[in-house]
Swiss-Prot record:
Monomer. Gene3D superfamilies: P-loop containing nucleotide triphosphate hydrolases. The gene is adk. Residues 31-64 are annotated as: NMP. Keywords: ATP-binding, Cytoplasm, Kinase, Nucleotide biosynthesis, Nucleotide-binding, Transferase. NCBIfam families: adk (TIGR01351). This is Adenylate kinase. It comes from Blochmanniella floridana.
Length: 226
């Protein structure tokens, strides 16, 4: 069992790599954003929040209250399919959320940070298409589906998210710098203490190059861990 966190700003490519790596190793791919949106859109969920306002927060790039997101993520990790390992994409975003993972006695084996320029992020996000149910991500230029607008696996329609525009992208990047960037120092210290392994990936590279680099990292260290 290997539990992995993909850390990086929106558009850094971590969602695409999460799908590829989870498929490669047969572990679960947990997209925090898609889990949250799905939960808020299903009427059987009853939150003490205004769901319309919460969806607006998500789409505008603002952080969602910990009281909402943390229980959803922990509940997802507790499901049986995650016992063989998982990738967390989009969570944690703050040190408080990282501590919540520890407090729930969930061990993390690897943290991968995707380092990428703002200009590359904007180019990647504009034109992105998402399969809502699975979180699989495509791009009309860089990673197109086999059929335009159709998910490769299910044949269901892909959508362009409301928050995938330049104005919201900049807002989300500002939020990332304000909160999430401190996770880099936090997890580097955890790595230095031997609690997990932390790596920085050049996210400006092509998808296939990043994928090969990740495979090399995991294969080498998983072999050592075994």
């Amino acid at each position: 069992m290997y539990n992995i966190i993909f850390l990086g700003p929106p558009g850094s490519g971590k969602g695409t790599q999460a799908h590829l790596i989870s498929t490669k190793y047969g572990i679960s791919n947990i997209s925090a954003g898609e889990i949250l949106k799905h939960a808020l859109s299903v009427t059987k969920f009853h939150f003490n929040f205004n769901t319309d306002n919460m969806l607006n927060q998500i789409n505008s790039g603002n952080l969602v209250d910990d009281e909402l997101i943390i229980p959803l993520i922990i509940k997802r990790i507790r499901q049986d399919d995650c016992k063989k390992g998982f990738i967390l994409d989009g969570f944690p975003r703050t040190i408080g959320q990282a501590i919540a993972i520890e407090q729930n006695k969930i061990a993390i084996d690897f943290v991968i940070e995707f380092n990428i320029s703002d200009s590359a992020i904007i180019n990647r996000i504009v034109g992105r298409q998402v399969h809502i149910k699975s979180g699989r991500t495509y791009h009309i230029k860089f990673n197109p589906p086999k059929l335009d607008g159709i998910d490769d696996i299910t044949g269901e329609k892909l959508v362009i998210r409301a928050d995938d525009n330049a104005q919201v992208i900049l807002q989300r990047l500002n939020q990332y710098r304000k909160y999430t960037i401190f996770l880099s120092d936090y997890y580097q210290k955890q790595s230095q203490q031997g609690n997990m392994r932390y790596f920085i990936i050049n996210g400006n590279q092509e998808i296939t190059k990043i994928y090969k680099e990740l495979i090399n990292i995991f294969n080498f260290h998983i072999f050592k861990m075994n």
